Each structure stands twice: as C-alpha cells, then as structure tokens.
Amino acid sequence: MFYGEYQHTIDPKGRAIVPSKFREGLGEKFILTKGLDGCLFAYSSEEWTSLENKLKSLPFTDKDVRAFIRFFFSGATECEVDKQGRILIPQNLREYAALEKDTYIIGVSSRVEIWDKTAWEAYNSDENISADKIAEKMALLGI
C-alpha cells in the first residue's frame, strides 16, 4: 500500500529519486506508464501483472476497451532503480506528464503517481475536487 506525498526534482538527464518507502513496495524494477489526469502511474511488477490480467479479460470487441488498453500499454516501460534510488523517466513520458523539474510523487493505494508540481497544485485547488464533494460521492457509493 502506498500513501504520502513527496516533493522531488528531476535532474537534467530526466532522473528522479523514488522515495525509499515507495522503493520498498515497487521493487528494484517496476512499470511506469501514462496515467490519468496528466500524471504518470507506477506499479510493482506484481500489481502490473494483476492489472494486465484484468484488462485482458475485458471484451476486445469494445472500442473503448481497445482505446484504453492501447493508451495504457503503449506508454508503459520497465524502470530500474539505480544505486542512488533514482529512475530514468523516458522523454516521451516526461512530455506526456509535462515533467520538467519540480515534481510531486504521491502514493495512491496500489500505485504511485508522478505529477508536475504545477499540475498537482492546480489539481488540488480545483473546486470540483474538494474533499467535501468527494466525500459526498463516496457516500453515494456506500463508502
């Protein structure tokens, strides 16, 4: 389980430090891919395999399923943590998430998300994503 929020920077070579608590759960090698809301998602190999199996069980004939699978898997890459606890974020993923220097690395249950600092702060200030509104929606779902 991943939780918490950490600020880090990406160096000029595109490397970012993965917080030690997240490295423990992700492992030395993990999958990084395009996420939703303009961020990147990181999954442990085990979680990725589980997610892959769930997605493979969806009806391939559904256009939206195919589109999501293409989006999700075409951006995926295996990352390896170096001795300094860093990963190299590929250029295409840095461009997708508009990652330049300042980032937030956050834990979200079964995955880690990497956000551009400005995008994360804008997301958190969005009135449609207030804690009260989210709580109301969760209550409707029985949570």
Curated annotation (Swiss-Prot):
Keyword Flavoprotein tagged: no
Major subcellular site: cytoplasm
GO cellular component, one term: nucleoid
CDD domains noted in UniProt: MraZ_C (cd16321), MraZ_N (cd16320)
PROSITE patterns associated with the record: SPOVT_ABRB
Domain SpoVT-AbrB, chain residue ranges per copy: 5-47, 76-119
HAMAP family: MraZ
Known partners and oligomeric status: Forms oligomers.
PANTHER family, A to Z: TRANSCRIPTIONAL REGULATOR MRAZ
Protein name: Transcriptional regulator MraZ
Species of origin: Ruminiclostridium cellulolyticum (strain ATCC 35319 / DSM 5812 / JCM 6584 / H10) (Clostridium cellulolyticum)
